Amino acid sequence: MRVANRPVNWFMKWFAIMLKASIRGSAKVSRLAADVIVAGAGPAGSTAARVAAASGLSTLVIERRAHVGVPVQCGEFLPTPKEMEDLFPKCPRGSRLANVPTRFVTNRCSRVRLISPRCSQFEFNLSANVIDRAQYDSWLASEAERHGADLRLSSTVLGMKGPDEVVFSDREGTHSAKAQVIVGADGPHSRIASSLGRRYMTHLEDLSLSIQYVMTNVDLDPDEIEMYFGDRIAPGGYAWIIPKGESIANVGLGIRSQFASDRTRLKTYLDRFVQRHPVAKTRTGRAKVASSVAALIPVGGPVTKTWSENVMLAGDAAGHVMACNGGGIPTALIDGEIAGQAAAKNIFEGLPLSWYEDTWRKETGTELETALMILHLADQILPSDVLTDACMRLAGSRYLEPLIRCRLPLPVGIAANTLVRLLKPIL
């Protein structure tokens, strides 16, 4: 019996091997190679991929979402090109990168109104475009593809295997891809940064927890953005109403966990703001929630080092967010272009990737560090509504405006520190 079964056993083994081989052959190749691999197709990643591909480099983009830009996880606020010149005076590329095609602009604003805990109001000029972030991000990715980049959607970066290999998974299994240059633009959860030992998620206090509703039937001035402060509203952060267009607004807030109550849910903070704030409820009293989203925003400043021999970190993965206001689109676009150029210079000319860090520090480093200094100053003030209100009234629009623009006037720093020393012991 054993002898008679041998041909059958051999045939079954052969059939199984051939079946597995045919399955592997019908699937995508599990081992890939490119000149440049970009993890993440947000503004930083797509811009880096476009620049690299346009330089003639084979470029692979790995994006975890099925649709680029969805869900939207920001207030969709982007300063105008003119404002970019003021915000980043050492960055020659900023105004050009902020020149968004008109079809993606849903509203244009020219003023900002700040509301203190006791509802004192301060207004100043600041021009911004409110964009359709989902459509804009999708366009940025399509521009990268148009220049030759290979975009892989629904693909999750798992980490790095060695200095030049990225491991990722999709519906067909696990794959690895090798490249001469790797750009980690995969957000504050960055697996690329984690593989380098520079993961941003190590310290929760370096993150802002944010939640946002898109609301319809909002009673608003479409020309004005509103920012609300108060420990009960948004501990360690602020709330916002950003008009997307006629009667539609992004209404949200960001908090810092170390200042918040462990028992209060993030959604509870936002609902309380929408329903109870004396000023906000006049805008949102008849409004309806169309959609909601939550996100993590890195506010701990840039990671210590954003490059290694063949890896660069860009955008949120590098901590490149204006810490005092949470803005990250401008720096992501700037990072992306510099990273794409650095990849080309590295591969074609042998220039070390340290050029990437030298360049972004020159163009945006001062502003990123100043924003972090302002946040640290605010951390001493925001836990007390009395102190926050007093500081805002003392500063007035004249000095609050540069703070929102991420500049720290000397009189503000001196006055704020003096008030903190005098009032904190009795509050």
Where do the protein language model's features map onto the residues?
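Extreme N-terminal leader/targeting segments of oxidoreductases
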Residues: 5-9, 13-36, 54-55
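Glycine-rich FAD pyrophosphate-binding loop
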Residues: 41, 53-73
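N-terminal Rossmann-fold NAD(P) dinucleotide-binding loop
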Residues: 45
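Predominantly flavin-linked oxidoreductase catalytic cores and closely associated redox partners
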Residues: 55, 67, 145-280, 303
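N-terminal FAD cofactor-binding segment of flavoenzymes
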Residues: 65-112
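Short beta-strand to alpha-helix junction loop
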Residues: 123-143, 191, 258-265
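FAD/FMN-dependent oxidoreductases across multiple families
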Residues: 259-342, 347-348
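C-terminal helical "tail/cap" subdomain of flavin- and related membrane-associated enzymes
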Residues: 341-427
